[in-house]
C-alpha cells in the first residue's frame, strides 16, 4: 500500500492511497465465497451454485463491497501509520478501477491543529477571597424562615416585601391591552415579578384604596406591541398582608436536615455555603483561565469538529426542553456555532496543557470529589456506591478533575491577584454565568 498526503487549505488534507491488485483480488474471492454460501438460484441447491453463475450474478456487488471496505480499512491504517490527528469523517473518492489492477482512491478530511501554548504568563486572573460571616449565615437562616412563613392581614400601608391582593386594568394610550387585566391577583412583592415601577406604585397604599400607576414597559419586553410603551394601571388594593417569620425553635430546626439545635443548623448551613462557595470560586477562576488561554492562543479549529459539537448542543437543547430527539436537526446551526467553536477551542487548549505537562488523573482527588458531591445528600454512602457502580458517572468526574489539574498548571504561570469579595457577590456572579 502506498500513501501520499497533500496539505490543502487550512486544516484540510487529502491522502491518496493505492492498494495492490493481489490484495483486492483476494478480498474479492472471499466476498464471492460468502455470496455462494447463501445464494439461492433455481435449479441448484443452496451452496452448490457454480462459481461462474455466482460471479455473473453477484460479481459487481461483491467488487463494490470490497472496494468500499478496503477504502475504510486502508484509510484508517494510513491514519495510524502516518499519525494523522483526524478531525471528523473523511470523504472518499475512488478512482476508476479495472479488475486485476491496483486500486487507488483519495480521502479528504480535516486534522486538528498542532498547538504550541504561549503567553501563559500574560493571563490575568482575579481570585475572589471570601470569608463567610455571621451576617451571611443570618441571611441564609432568613431564607429558610421565609420558606416556612405565614401571612397576617394588615390595615397598614403596603411595604416593599408585603403580599397584596389586587384588581388591575392596564391601558396604553387609553386602550386596554391583552393580558393587562386581572381580578383578585395575589402578588408577593419584592421578587421583581412585575415590570419596573409596578410594585413601587403599590407601596404606601392601604387596603380599600383605588389609584393609578404610571409605568413604562421595558424595551426587551416579550410582547412586541408593548415594548417601550408608557402604560397606566388602574389598581384596586383589596388586601395587604405582612410576612410572619417562624421563631428559631428546635421544632423549626428539625424541619431541615439532621440538625437538632440552632447551633447545629448554623454549622450545617455554613458547611453547605462553604461547598457552594468553593465551587463558585473554582468556576470563576477556571473561566478566567480559559478566557486567557483563548486570548493568548488564537487557533484554527476544524469545521468538522465544530459541526459535531453543534449536534451535541442541539440534542442537549431539545432534551432540556423536553422535545423529541428528531427535533434537534430542525434547530438552526447558527444558534450554537459560537458556543460549539469555543468548546472545541477549550478542548484543544486544555488537551495541549495536559499532554505537554504529562498530566495524569489524580485518583485520590476523584474519590474526594465524589465524596464531596455525596455529602450534599441525606445518604452519602448510597451516592458514593452509585458512582462506584456507574462507570460513565465516574469517568465524568475523572474528566472534571483532569481539567482542574490543567487549569492549576496554567494558574501557576498566570498573573493572579486576590480580591476580597462578599459571599453574596460571588454567588451572584455565579448565577449570571
Swiss-Prot record:
Keywords: Cell cycle, Cell division, Chaperone, Cytoplasm, Isomerase, Rotamase. Its EC number is 5.2.1.8. It catalyses: [protein]-peptidylproline (omega=180) = [protein]-peptidylproline (omega=0). InterPro entries: PPIase_dom_sf, PPIase_FKBP_dom, Trig_fac, Trigger_fac_C, Trigger_fac_C_sf, Trigger_fac_ribosome-bd_bac, Trigger_fac_ribosome-bd_sf, Trigger_fact/SurA_dom_sf. One of its GO terms (cellular component) is cytoplasm. Residues 161-246 form the PPIase FKBP-type domain. Its main location: cytoplasm. It is found in: Cytoplasm. Pfam families: FKBP_C (PF00254), Trigger_C (PF05698), Trigger_N (PF05697). GO terms for molecular function: peptidyl-prolyl cis-trans isomerase activity; protein folding chaperone; ribosome binding. One of its GO terms (biological process) is protein unfolding. NCBIfam families: tig (TIGR00115). Belongs to the FKBP-type PPIase family. Tig subfamily. Involved in protein export. Acts as a chaperone by maintaining the newly synthesized protein in an open conformation. Functions as a peptidyl-prolyl cis-trans isomerase. Consists of 3 domains; the N-terminus binds the ribosome, the middle domain has PPIase activity, while the C-terminus has intrinsic chaperone activity on its own. This is Trigger factor. It comes from Actinobacillus pleuropneumoniae serotype 3 (strain JL03). The lineage of its organism: Bacteria, Pseudomonadati, Pseudomonadota, Gammaproteobacteria, Pasteurellales.
Amino acid at each position: 500500500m502506498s500513501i501520499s498526503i497533500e496539505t490543502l487549505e487550512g486544516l484540510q488534507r487529502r491522502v491518496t492511497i493505492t492498494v495492490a491488485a493481489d490484495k483486492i483480488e483476494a478480498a474479492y474471492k472471499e466476498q464471492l465465497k460468502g455470496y455462494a454460501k447463501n445464494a439461492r438460484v433455481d435449479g441448484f441447491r443452496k451452496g452448490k451454485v457454480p462459481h461462474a453463475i455466482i460471479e455473473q450474478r453477484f460479481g459487481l456487488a461483491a467488487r463494490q463491497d470490497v472496494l468500499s471496505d478496503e477504502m475504510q480499512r486502508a484509510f484508517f491504517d494510513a491514519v495510524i501509520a502516518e499519525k494523522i490527528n483526524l478531525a471528523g469523517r473523511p470523504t472518499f473518492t475512488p478512482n476508476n478501477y479495472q479488475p486485476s489492477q491496483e486500486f487507488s482512491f483519495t480521502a479528504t478530511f480535516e486534522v486538528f491543529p498542532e498547538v504550541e501554548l504561549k503567553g501563559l504568563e500574560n493571563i490575568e486572573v482575579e481570585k475572589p477571597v471570601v470569608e463567610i460571616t455571621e451576617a451571611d449565615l443570618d441571611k441564609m437562616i432568613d431564607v429558610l424562615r421565609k420558606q416556612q412563613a405565614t401571612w397576617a392581614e394588615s390595615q397598614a400601608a403596603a411595604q416593599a416585601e408585603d403580599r397584596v391582593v389586587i384588581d388591575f386594568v392596564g391601558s396604553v394610550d387609553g386602550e386596554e391591552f391583552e393580558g393587562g387585566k386581572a381580578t383578585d391577583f395575589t402578588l408577593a412583592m419584592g421578587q421583581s415579578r412585575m415590570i419596573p415601577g409596578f410594585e413601587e406604585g403599590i407601596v404606601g397604599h392601604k387596603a380599600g384604596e383605588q389609584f393609578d400607576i404610571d409605568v413604562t414597559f421595558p424595551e426587551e419586553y416579550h410582547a412586541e406591541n408593548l415594548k417601550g410603551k408608557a402604560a397606566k394601571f388602574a389598581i384596586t388594593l383589596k388586601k395587604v398582608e405582612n410576612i410572619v417569620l417562624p421563631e428559631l425553635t428546635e421544632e423549626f430546626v428539625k424541619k431541615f436536615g439532621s440538625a437538632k439545635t440552632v447551633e447545629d443548623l448554623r454549622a450545617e448551613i455554613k458547611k453547605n455555603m462553604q461547598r457552594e462557595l468553593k465551587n463558585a470560586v473554582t468556576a470563576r477562576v477556571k473561566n478566567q483561565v480559559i478566557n486567557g488561554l483563548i486570548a493568548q492562543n488564537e487557533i484554527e479549529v476544524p469545521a468538522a469538529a465544530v459541526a459535531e459539537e453543534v449536534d451535541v448542543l442541539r440534542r442537549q437543547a431539545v432534551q432540556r426542553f423536553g422535545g423529541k430527539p428528531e427535533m434537534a436537526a430542525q434547530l438552526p446551526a447558527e444558534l450554537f456555532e459560537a458556543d460549539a467553536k469555543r468548546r472545541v477551542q477549550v478542548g484543544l487548549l486544555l488537551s495541549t496543557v495536559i499532554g505537554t505537562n504529562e498530566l495524569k488523573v489524580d485518583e485520590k482527588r476523584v474519590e474526594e470529589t465524589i465524596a464531596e458531591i455525596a455529602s450534599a445528600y441525606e445518604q452519602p454512602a448510597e451516592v458514593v456506591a452509585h458512582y462506584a457502580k456507574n462507570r460513565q458517572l465516574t469517568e465524568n468526574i475523572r474528566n472534571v478533575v483532569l481539567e482542574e489539574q490543567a487549569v492549576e498548571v496554567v494558574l501557576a504561570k498566570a498573573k493572579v491577584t486576590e480580591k476580597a469579595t462578599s459571599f453574596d457577590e460571588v454567588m451572584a456572579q455565579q448565577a449570571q454565568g
